[in-house]
């Protein structure tokens, strides 16, 4: 028996839908009664305001029919945001896939609130989420606090957080399956939250950390034997005391250090194959720290540019 014949008709259709962008999977509900709720079983979910406001791809659940963008665009966008929020509120708790393999959220208008992000992430985690990606960038700059159950999610393999997210790591937590962690310009609950998180990710392979003004991080040790790829960035206005990197398995390293003084210590990268370094100072010292690299890209920032 081949693999396809092992599926029921509905299971096969759901499998096919899972390969479509989620917004297109939703639109199939208008095809027939059989298709009406099939998208509710797709295990990969994505709600993206950027996609929603591309009028040529608008779906009747979210947007009214608009032939051209005019002076009423803002009110249309606001109304559409409310439609999308209501749609998620109604359907996400009822999503019938037993496992939500991935949930991707990207919101930037005032329609979406921090409490929404927290609730929707909590629902995904309760369904054994394997991938979570949240980009939250509202005008009011309120941070979304992640639910506590996230920090004990045994199934989570990929976690990507960006912008107005508050990462408040408890003292006791467990993410035993986490291999990919991207933290870009988020805020941390205290000066030790990021350090606690990195110190207890024993199988982490891919790490992206972008530090920015007001994120509460002052110093950081990246000591992760399993790490293969590291992208580490600091803005020029970071109030930062220093960092230490000890990653014996690392193969790819990207460093963007725009801080005013170099205060880094790179100790152990014997397997490094490629490095991409952007900095404002102490290039000679940085080069001495990555002597084993096979491919090196350098970008010298102007110290006078503010």
PLM region descriptions:
Residues 2-223:
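Leucine-rich repeat
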Residues 35, 274-306:
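C-terminal amphipathic alpha-helical segment
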Residues 45, 272-273:
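A broad, low-specificity signal marking well-ordered, structured residues that form hydrophobic/aromatic
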Residues 118-123, 147-154, 170-178, 194-203, ...:
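A structural signal for leucine-rich repeat
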Residues 166, 214, 235, 255-260, ...:
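Hydrophobic lipid-interacting interfaces of membrane-associated proteins
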